[in-house]
Amino acid sequence: MTRSVRQVFFAFAAFAALIGAANVPSARSLAAAPSDDQAVIAADRAFEKAVAQDPVALAMQTDPAFTWIDATGTLQSRQEILDAFGAGSAPQLVVLTTAVDVQLTTRVYGRLAFVQVHAGRGYSLRVFAKGKDGWRTLHVIELTQPAQAAAASATGAAVPSEEGVITECVNPCKLVPFTPATPAAKAAFADWREMEMGSLTRNMDLWGRHVLDDVLIVDSGGSGTISKAQRIANTLKQKQAGVRTNEVPPVLWARTLDFGDAVLLLMLQQPYKGQPYYAARIYVNRDGRYQMAVSYHTAIASVPDFALSKQLPAK
């Protein structure tokens, strides 16, 4: 099955599959040593260099579980990317650390870390995992925002790609087509679902409990980044206007990568209006619960917009 066919299959066929998950997190503190910050930065620069010219080095710089979601919304595995070098079709980063006016951010959470590289309309999130051989690239998600932001909808979606309709929330509020495999992954996934319940009900206290203060949300349908404060303000504006739409996109597919106090959540979601998108989120164990540290959304360009009038019923 080709990647494009596989993506369409997810978007059309997986929508009806529904199962659930929940659990309770452990509580441990996270602290990053300065040497870890520098090691992650060095790993990111080595990854950039390998992507540009050296598949052998790329294999050495990436984790066996490495995946890459490019700006078109194409998901590729490590082996697919290495094979693409031989075919002359290897993906290229949309923005480099050497770009003019680049904005760089590095965060380390135990054995999981990320580097954000932003310049112009290009946004790149590189996620790194620490193993016995040091830091290796685990995941990349990228996006390019439109030159001109789309006109605001009548309901003023809090996140541009998540515009909703008035309908019951079945997936993910009640049932989800995914069961995390480990206690930490179950806890992070359960806290993500509780965060989304806050979004659905426009209860920003509940939503905010599961979001770190320095979080950045980056959406391929938006313009710039969205801070925690801005996301809350967007939703409260909706609430004051009486907007009651469901802006919690159903989950079609998910994957978790568990690093104890930090968990990477990868999802394919279908908004009620618009294209399906891949999301990459990192959840960190703080204050006895998992909280979102970063969230990137990249629409799948090869799949047309959907316009769903209501949530599909639970089976």
Residue ranges, per PLM feature:
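A mature extracytoplasmic/lumenal domain signature
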Residues: 62, 72-73, 118-120, 126, ...
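Surface-exposed, charged secondary-structure patches
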Residues: 37-39, 80-122, 230-277
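Short beta-strand edge/turn micro-motifs at domain boundaries
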Residues: 123-173, 276-306
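Short, low-complexity N-terminal intrinsically disordered segments enriched in polar/charged residues
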Residues: 26-64, 138, 144-205, 209, ...
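Hydrophobic pocket/interface hotspot
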Residues: 57-59, 66, 81, 115, ...
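A short gly/proline-enriched turn/hairpin at secondary-structure junctions
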Residues: 65-76, 80, 88-93, 214-226, ...
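Bacterial N-terminal signal peptides
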Residues: 9-21
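N-terminal secretory signal peptides that target proteins for export/translocation
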Residues: 1-6
